[in-house]
Amino acid sequence: MTARLLRGGPAADALLAEATARAARLPAPPQLVMLRLGEDPASVSYVRGKDRKAREVGLKSTVYALPETTSQAELLDLIARLNADDTVNGILVQLPLPLHIQEQAVLHAIDPRKDVDGFHPLNVGELWAGRPALRPCTPAGILYLLDHYGIPVAGQRAVVVGRSSIVGRPLAGLLLHRDATVTVAHSRTPDLGAVTREADLLCVAVGRPHLITPDMVRPGATVVDVGINRVLGEGGGKAQLTGDVAPEVAQVAGAITPVPGGVGPMTIAQLLANTVLAAELQAKGRAAR
């Protein structure tokens, strides 16, 4: 048996088409502002990709490329000005930040109504209360991907391997609110395979190449691989992207997301969908004044 591939491209296109149609009904194109500190190649690439995709779907995108030496006070002052600007609908601070800046202080400074990453404590609390608006992009994108391919969630035994505040924890919360029975495991879970073999739906976000092997997966399960790891090719050759799930798992699973090309496109699509939603909610709030 070879698993059905759950490619992110078609699902991301569908999500973006919905967001574009909603954006067209707004008085002005939603504006996403992204802040990047320094010239880390990965951060530069990520922001460039988000900026390009935002423009493709008709959003206004503004990028602040700030020096790595920017102080925390200067960054917080810029965020305060963006919070007060009614033409700005979404604010994203590209992580990681330089060591001299406190990440949580920065993320907490963003107006929760413009927090399109879904990391502000207020938005985290709303998620766990079962009434999320701006949801973290990767977990929300995963749910959309599953829905797009008709993968059931309600009533399923879901195992989330990974407990980060960006993916693992919020994904567990979203799955709970979709009536899955959820277990959260991690790299220190004893006998991890015994836990993962119970899963109808296995989501892995640890950042450890090929952590999940075929013997750890129940035959026919759906496997969502969130990991993106750079590993050297055979003989020290060119680095390749690989996931947290070994390729051989595709011979056991019923459905699986590829790496690359699985969850990655969904994260960007959900970011832009969140920007449109933020603009809609802000417009509704202004109309109610």
From Swiss-Prot:
GO BP, one annotated term: methionine biosynthetic process
Pfam name, any one: THF_DHG_CYH
Matches recorded under InterPro entries: Aminoacid_DH-like_N_sf, NAD(P)-bd_dom_sf, THF_DH/CycHdrlase, THF_DH/CycHdrlase_cat_dom, THF_DH/CycHdrlase_CS, THF_DH/CycHdrlase_NAD-bd_dom
Pathway: One-carbon metabolism; tetrahydrofolate interconversion
NADP recorded as keyword: yes
Binding annotation for NADP(+): G162, R163, S164, S187, I228
Signal peptide: none
Database matches in CDD domains: NAD_bind_m-THF_DH_Cyclohyd
GO molecular function: methenyltetrahydrofolate cyclohydrolase activity; methylenetetrahydrofolate dehydrogenase (NADP+) activity
Record keyword tRNA-binding present: no
UniProt keyword annotations, A-Z: Amino-acid biosynthesis, Histidine biosynthesis, Hydrolase, Methionine biosynthesis, Multifunctional enzyme, NADP, One-carbon metabolism, Oxidoreductase, Purine biosynthesis
Reaction equation(s) it catalyzes: (6R)-5,10-methylene-5,6,7,8-tetrahydrofolate + NADP(+) = (6R)-5,10-methenyltetrahydrofolate + NADPH; (6R)-5,10-methenyltetrahydrofolate + H2O = (6R)-10-formyltetrahydrofolate + H(+)
EC number of the protein: 1.5.1.5, 3.5.4.9
Cellular component terms per the entry's GO annotation: cytosol
Primary role: Catalyzes the oxidation of 5,10-methylenetetrahydrofolate to 5,10-methenyltetrahydrofolate and then the hydrolysis of 5,10-methenyltetrahydrofolate to 10-formyltetrahydrofolate.
UniProt family annotation: Belongs to the tetrahydrofolate dehydrogenase/cyclohydrolase family.
Complex formation: Homodimer.
Protein's UniProt name: Bifunctional protein FolD 2
Annotated organism of origin: Deinococcus geothermalis (strain DSM 11300 / CIP 105573 / AG-3a)
